[in-house]
Amino acid sequence: MATTISNLPRELIEEILSRVPLRAMKAMRLTCKSWNNLSKSESFMKMHIGKAATREEKTMMVAVMPHTLALVSVVVDGVNPSTELKGQFSFLDKEFFIYRVIHYEGLLLCILKDATRIVVWNPYLGQERWIQIRYSHRPHGVDHFKYAVGYADKVSCRSVKLLRFLDYFHKASDKPFFWYEIYDFDSCLWTTLDITPHWGISWTYPRVSLKGNTYWPAREMNTKGFQDHIICFDFTSERFGPLLPLPRAQGCHVSLSCVKEEKLAVLLKHRLHHDSYEYEFEIWITTKIDVEMVSWSKFLRMDMRPKIKLPLSFYVDEEKKVFMGFDHGEYPKLFLNIIGETGFLRKLDLGVHEGHRSPCSYVPSLVQIKHPAGDKMIKQSSLEDRRFAQNSLRLAAIEKLIN
């Protein structure tokens, strides 16, 4: 009698199915109930992610399209770098338009054109969580709130949280307005945080998630010029740490990235001479980092031939000594510049339009996105209701002044 795959030992079935590409995981789970259950086991997920990370040594990224996310792989071999469109993740009804995507250690925070809701999504596990926004602030169609997703390590599991904040310095207002709030995925509650910042975080500078916390380029509030520090939000204590120094403090454009979910990389662009317009790039990588301390080591220095702009998003391959940065100079196409120790290597067409937003890195994650238990809904406290009402009234007053 012929042996079917269902008759094979569980360990062998795991080994076979762990070779399924990431883009085909949804179809595999729908094939049969036993495969779906097996794919959710911790042993299978660790094996599958391990194979996906090492297979062909590819860098994975997702590009935002109106209703789907395209999965793109980049292979850097030093001779013939290449990109490949691997497929698409689709989870939203056509009525929902993806406005922006932010990647946090395998979780994707999708900001929608619908200003009333956002969604946190784990494409690898096929899990998503819709969150109702308490107050939308989008002057001229631009969401001015800043977002971060992270987690607090508990004894038995990771508790996922969403940080949302607004630090307003509009000249029409008589004084600065700050609103920091956090959403707990376990309790389904919003909490207004008591934070008065002495720092400034620019809306245009991308954040980086590392080991459950989030880092931004930042500077002292009453100073002018470039961001010359970084700052971390600790999702366990629900507090910001102190301003941490960058390796070069003055006169640099700054962009952050993550190296294998273990280190931070900072890209610094600065003038070679005070009175010239010749620039160079430096990339530094952390040797130690936590909420309250950081140390850096220089990784790569690049000249500007051919001239490239400072990318808001970039990647680093530490082993191959390679930098990959996005090039927006040939709208509507989007390219990836690849530069190594020996100089410029290749300019690759990513095959997606800039109108679909810049890609972000993607690393599969085992972080579970819990759904609220319908019979255990907790009501917001009266104190939180008052705090929310006060902030809503103040922000509404500012909106009238600036509109």
From Swiss-Prot:
Per the database record, which ranges form the F-box domain? 2-47
Record InterPro entries: F-box-assoc_dom_typ1, F-box-assoc_interact_dom, F-box-like_dom_sf, F-box_dom, SCF_F-box_component
Its domain of life reads Eukaryota
- UniProt xrefs under SMART domains: FBOX (SM00256)
- Note the NCBIfam families from the entry: F_box_assoc_1 (TIGR01640)
Q: What is this protein called?
A: Putative F-box protein At5g41500
From which source organism is this entry?
A: Arabidopsis thaliana (Mouse-ear cress)
Origin organism lineage:
Eukaryota, Viridiplantae, Streptophyta, Embryophyta, Tracheophyta
